[in-house]
Amino acid sequence: PEPVGDPEIARFAALQRTYPARGGKGLRGRLLLAAAYAHGADPADALPVAAALELFQNWVLVHDDVEDDSDERRGAPALHREVGVPVAINVGDAMHVAMWRALLATDAPWRDAVLHEFATTIARTAEGQHLDLAWVTEGRFDVDAAAYLAMVERKTAIYTVVAPLRLGAHVAATPPDPRFEAAGRQLGAAFQIRDDLLDVEGQTEVIGKTAGADEAHGKATWPGLFGIEAAYERIEELDSRARAALSGVEGNTQ
């Protein structure tokens, strides 16, 4: 049992709030709520799932910062820079548990579908992260466009766009439209390439993390592999493909 009133446990709980307290876009949670509404659900019913998805984003960032040896996150030192790698990993693990607890707290009829979606999403994200890390370890800079897009689909697109859209449909007890997955893959890849560009063109104090870190750590990014102009061109192409995939999708769009 937990020691009653142990100040170190209170500190541990506070550390779990570090990244959420720094803010962030809330993109994934907001997209999930919008998808739930578009499918006819009350967005309030989706709030626990949206909160769990934001917890997912935050514990993944804690671990990602360790794996990437990042210096900053959201305008402040990365957690492992403040408390050390072992403590930061443990904090991320606890946040991971909090995510599952948030999902298990509901007895809604869609719970099993949502749990399965989360499990699948986490597995795909881990696969994408492994590819990214493996390329760094191997010093790979011969990655072609197809391999890069396959990596970011797993690492970024699924949990950033595809899963939020599908989860919103699950909360509405509606089968996810396959066009969402098609569009989500395109939008997620565009999101990652924009992030790659921010690392090249952004300023640390604006983007909230160390600019130039990807190049410094030997990461394979779209601008690094194919050039900045090609990055902007691919973003425009991916956005167009996403709009085409979503054409004709019906639902609440106001």
Where are these regions (language model features)?
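N-terminal amphipathic/basic leader segments beginning at the initiator methionine
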Residues: 1-3
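Mg2+-dependent prenyl diphosphate-binding active-site environment of isoprenoid biosynthetic enzymes
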Residues: 6-246
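Short, intrinsically disordered, charge-balanced linker/junction segments flanking boundaries
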Residues: 250-254
